[in-house]
């Protein structure tokens, strides 16, 4: 496990977060949203990598490296980084990385160069009818100090601020109809709680058209009959109440992104689950 790099100087960060990279102001908390790349803001990228690694290690993951930066962040046609900046504290409070579907490149085998492509197979229907109108999201994080369980009111709107940025993408790119990406659940998460979440997602949001399929499907280990009896409602809302109650009984919370996406989006698809390859 490498030691995480020291924070990047605030003056250096401010110099790279120039006005031409500012996407918009947030609806709440008076923060600022920027879009940068490794090529135009290398020091901001380092700070993002530092904050990602801290946040992911705290959740039971992380790369184990000094920064969480990979080839998709630094390649020739890199993922863009959407970051929320607190101008008062002069610090980053969270971010996503994203790639517009109509900018996706393909390798010599016709495979899309996507961060999820090593874990999932994409159908021809998805590649032709969905990808050009899609944004792939990944590496979402909220800086540890702004996570609501730790920060109280300071972190209350951190996720909302990030979503302001995603909403702005649909304005500047009006052809965007869909967002997709993977949500990670670490091995440290309670196994039965994980199975409950997966069963719930597959029941209410399953991808019946097999647009995207896992290369290494993760099997639910908990007794299926027990899960069927537990989640016995046709209503998503009623089953969600049960899920929330049962996961809390295990001493865990539903992961923030699972909670946010399922509650906020009516047209959601869960494309099964892939074990990390």
Language model segments and positions:
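Conserved N-terminal entry element of GNAT/NAT acetyltransferase domains
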Residues: 2-39
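A structural signal for well-ordered alpha-helical scaffolds and beta->alpha junctions
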Residues: 10, 41, 49, 254-255
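Short amphipathic alpha-helix that is part of the acyltransferase structural core
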Residues: 25-70, 80-100
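Short acidic (Asp/Glu) patches
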Residues: 61-69, 75-79, 99, 109-126
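A short acidic/small-residue loop/turn micro-motif
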Residues: 100-102, 277
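Acyl-donor binding region in acyl/amide transferases
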Residues: 103-265
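Conserved small/polar residues in nucleotide/adenosyl-binding loops
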Residues: 266-276
